[in-house]
Amino acid sequence: MERTYVMIKPGFLQHEDAIIARIEGIGAKVSHKKVMQLDDEILNRHYAEHIGKGFFAELVNYMKSGEVIAMYVEREGENLVQDIRTIVGSTKDPAPGTIRHDFGIGEITRNVIHSSDSAESAARELGIFFPEFN
């Protein structure tokens, strides 16, 4: 069973059902989810590689601006992380038919959704947001 982490960002929770339907459309399932209000501690752990970069403060402020939906996603087989990233779409120029294109507002930071970029990132992020299942 492969697993990955997906998070709906502040301001986009109204798209939860449609986003989950797209995840299920590739044969994956959201096995655990929770609505959370993020704080500095969890954001510093989640975005550790971005600490000190010019956009970090804006990113943290945005991510604290409202609730998020954290999701533990699983699927039998291979390539779950890549398949999720395909339906999510690129950060800068998402293609039509992707989650970021279809539900986004054209901003890089406020881009609807986060998904792990590798199996290693998925394990780390699931450990941060779902320690009870790791």
Label for each model-derived stretch:
Residues 1-134:
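Non-catalytic terminal and connector segments of soluble metabolic enzymes
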